[in-house]
Amino acid sequence: MYTTSILTFIFATISVAFFTYRIVQKMKKSDNATEEYFTGGRALTWPIVAGSLLLTNLSTEQLVGLNGDVFGDKALVGLAWEALAAFAMIATALIFLPRYLASGFTTTPAFLEKRFDKTTRSIVSGLFLFGYVTVLLPVVLYTGSLALKSMFNINISLWLIVIIIGSLGSAYAIFGGLKSVAVSDTINGVGLLIGGLAIPFLGLSALGEGSFLNGVSILLNDKPEYLRVLTRTNLDESIVSVPWPTLFTGMMFIQIFYWSTNQVIVQRAMAAKSLAEGQKGVLFASAMKLVGPLMLCLPGIIALHMSELPIGRQDQVYGAMVRYVLPDWSLGLFAAVLMGSILSSFNSALNSASTLFSLQFYKGYINQNASGEQIVKIGKKFGVFIAIASMMIAPLLAQTQSVFQYLQKVNGLYSVPIIGIFLLGISTKHVPAIAAKVGMFVGMAIYAFFSFENLHNVHPFFADASGDLHWLHGYFISFVSAIVVMLVIGKYKPKTADEIAISDQRDSTPVDMTPWSGSKKASAGIMGMTFTIYILLSLVAE
């Protein structure tokens, strides 16, 4: 890296920290220490909710992983991860968020305690923590380090970069709380939107030998099959990572898990100052997800047309593209933007993990009389512990072929049972707590079978590239099995009328529960735009 790039990187990173500090100091503070630290005092407005949602999700595990998958697929099927996310976010805004806010919950598992029992909440909280420590946090650290290393060809150990990023992210989350995390997310989000969109623009210009329009023409006319969004196989007749049948099985449910029940994501919306502000933020973020493929998929497609890029494995595509198209003077600035997205996802997951441990396990079992200050103190200590654990695990991910597929597959082990009990908790009243527990373990066991043994030589319609049952179909079968088990138990051993009455009781909520009047129209518009994008790309790829 040149001196100018280093100075630009340092200046931009410090500037974000400075403006975050100034903005947070001016925001309304809650007298409740726990509420202030873990939900930002419930003072977030819709732009901050939207910005934090987007940047928590839009990080290097997406930029590196999804662009790599698109490149490896030689097709645009990865668009489904963004398009169906928009649908799941609509469900969050209209269905899940009103139920979470109605009782003033601080965590999503708290809803399960109300609907089922404390043990169910504890099991789900434990599963979330397992996922954050073994999957989400290490993946963010690994992909972030890999992106920075490949962008600048830095001759530094991956371990060292992981430690640097992990330490910086920990400082935001542990010492600043959710409010600092959300504000820094919003500031970094603006930079990432500008910088992220610049990469495909410059890539198309480079493809067109200096002409953006020529680049677009090449993209549309030279092997337009690369733009297929609904297909099972690519030009090489290889089965792609997201065959179109999976859109109607596991894909939709894994999106609902991530956007509607995952503590890391939903905690931002739960910190909104009112239901209307939360719905506006979630739906604006949903609309912006439709812009996401320009950053998360298009660079991978452009790279397919650029044989001169030095790409050893597919997860190196994004870093190679950035290094190829950006002028030297701007590398430091983009590195700061990328660092912001890395820190955002890392510190968001860290804050959510601290929230779950402190409120569920420490307050719930270890010290039930703990004060707000004690809970926050323990949360910070636990944050340090899992930050160190994730830094130790992250470099081990270098052994995986596709880090994005690793993220989604391992997530399935605990998300299958979680999404099932959340959906039944919202849609039914008679399913008892024992059904939730049995259903969770049945779902996990069946998904574990598909992950480690699987069905071999299945019909091509249901197969992955190796001929085994595609993992998203396995996810769907596991999910349906868990639901069936819970419903059967609920039929023969339903809740009593008294138990249902207790579940229906609502605690007081600290926020205004008036919904946003434009939420349904906005949702319809987002769905219409999604279908239009699919139709247009399908026509172009023919």
Segments the model singles out, each with a brief description of its role:
Residues 1-542:
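Membrane-embedded helix-loop-helix hairpins and adjacent transmembrane boundary segments
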